Amino acid sequence: MVPFDKKNLFLTGEDEAEGYCQTGYGVCPDGTGFVANRTYMPGVTVDMMDWWFPWHSVGSDLRYKIWDPKDHYFARADRAAYVLDPRVPMKEKTWGVDHYIMEDTGAGPEFLQLCFKRPSDFGYDESLVGKGKCASLVCAIGKSRIAAAMTHKWYPYKEGILFCSRFWIGFGWVDGRIVKTLPEGAEIPAKAARGLYHHSIEEFTNLAAILPDVYRENRDNF
């Protein structure tokens, strides 16, 4: 998979042209792990996905549970008033917001804090967002037993969108930067990467099936 320091290639789609993994998981020579996945979502639009990420973090816990009923328990934004503020553009409603989550990615229910970032704070070139193979995105640092950096991007594709995910496992937020936090000599267990990979496939396949109806019925019920 594309290395974290070359992550802008993911936004442009050049990582595929350069032969980096698009779907799979593994452990890198430095011990960090990776997960790559992409999901075709027919009937889903860019605007629907922009709406989904803030919408499911406020209001009823059911919003997160319907995403993946077997493995999702709750997701709660720490700045609900900001998320609900109609003056905040939809694409910015995750910026600087932490989601406190309970979910099961293969090792049993686990608490997770997802710290969402503005793309530039994550280290992305924001001029690449909103065009080509990155119509929109969300990016976050996950704090749990194992720290990870995460990006989901999406763009129009066929009769819907193509939703693409990347997880760099063993990277965390230190002094305002994202760096490798995995201790030297340590290695991410392959089963951890595999569990996250299978969970990603399941949750986004589920989301592709429900989002058009959920959006149609709730778009004005933020």
Model feature map: region roles:
Residues W55, I101, F111, N206-A209, ...:
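A generic structural signal for well-ordered alpha-helical segments enriched in polar/charged residues
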Residues W55-G59, D71, H99, K158, ...:
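Short, isolated positions within intrinsically disordered regulatory regions of eukaryotic proteins
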Residues A148:
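Anaerobic metallocofactor- and corrinoid-dependent redox/one-carbon enzyme cores
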Residues W51-W55, W67, W95, W154, ...:
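A residue-identity detector for tryptophan
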Residues V44, K131-G132, Y155-G160:
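Short, solvent-exposed coil/turn segments at beta-strand boundaries
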Residues M1-D30, I141-K143, K153-F222:
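Terminal "cap-and-tail" regions of soluble proteins that handle hydrophobic small molecules
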